[in-house]
Amino acid sequence: VTVRGRRVELDAVFVLHHRPWRDTSRMLDVFTREHGRLMLFARGVRGPRSRSASLLQPFVPLLASWTGSGETAQLTQVEAAPGGSVVGLPAGALLSGWYLNELLLKLVLRADPQPAVFDLYARTLDRLRDGQAVAAVLRGFERDLLVQLGFGLELGREAQGGAPLQADRYYHFHPSLGFVATSDDAEAAYAGRSLLALAEDDLQEDAVLEDARRLMRTALDDALEGRELRTRSVAR
């Protein structure tokens, strides 16, 4: 990536959302590796002679250049990232991809560089392209996103005293506190073995996946602070 005054050259970029702007242009909500989320104006890309329209689609890894900053930045160049897919996601993974995008749009602040989150997103798209189990892929993304954005999801220890979680015990989760041991018949308790499996990305068993789904929903609800996710139904 090169930064020259108010010009940025060839940063890694994904388009999260786009909408028409005037007759032949688009407004792009993009996630860049080194500059975070930005709004870019892409002039003329909807015109009949545009060569970049097919590239400026969600889920396609790109290299982009732009001038300006804030709400006035303008796209000046775009090309496919070396070695990246130029066809987005397969049809069966599209809804999951939109769910990832909505999480980023809701939780990642504008102009806040998050290179680790960018890399996590890119890896997750690759896993979806490879046809890996969708539920396990989404739970892993949710877990790592919350950790990277500082929401304090500590899967390995109890909130009070920091004792390691035990596989044969059960726990309640309090978003502002963490995990608290409880009895095995407590309502909405999480199995310790499920929490440890989630921490190790071992998401093959149905019981583990169900506990992981419930936990991630609770943790994300807290992070979203009441904002709704339109795509949440695909994350079950």
Model-derived features: positions:
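Non-catalytic alpha-helical scaffolds and adjoining flexible linkers that form interface surfaces
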Residues: 1-236
